[in-house]
Amino acid sequence: MKLRFAGATDIGRKRKQNQDRFLIQPEDNLFVVCDGMGGHLGGEVASQMAVDDMANFFIQTRTDDEITWPYRPDKRLSILENKLTVSIKWANWNIFHKAAEEVELNGMGTTSVAIAVDEKHLAIAHVGDSRCYRIRGGEITQLTTDHSLLEEYKKYSALSEEEIANFAYKNVITRSLGMKVTVLVDTQTHPKKTGDLYLLCCDGLYGELEDPQEILHTINEFRSNLDEAATELIARANRRGGRDNITVVLVELY
């Protein structure tokens, strides 16, 4: 089974900087989207550090089997889940300490959502409110749950659609890289299935295209060319307002 993939990012229509970053590392079947936050330049620094640290960890573990991991693997997780988790934790540690050392970077952080693929499985890891969707059999499914204040409220209260739409703190996240010296990473593993397509994206996309069916229809319309699909998703989010940076990565199994 092979992979097709594409990624794109855009500053949007309201922001002065693009604090998003994405990574496509075909040698390791590694795909990442990060949405940075904090300070004048902090968000850009944090998201760039995250993709760099994750990329380097996968490179080092690919080329050196004897390398000492910065965190002990969790026996309950698959090797792919462990590699994603440790790479994110390592990035978090570096971001946290850099923010503590440099005053102008205090408070910086980033989300991260990532996919890694091996011979039989596809693993997903995430921190924050950047998402992973899967398109299978003509249906789109959100596989990740946002680490946000809204999701915390939904655990304990039955909110109506109107209450969710008008929730005042919808964009407040409860986890990010750089927030604390350690970070809890959510992971999951799925068997590979021919025809599956995975979308990694930040809130700049789904905040404008709020109906997942619109995301599905856009991808299906341009599915023969994933670069065009990624470009069109961003264009439609910009036409809806482009209030934030917009980043997407598409990964299809065929």
Which positions does each model-derived feature cover?
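PP2C/PPM-type serine/threonine phosphatase catalytic domain
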Residues: 1-254
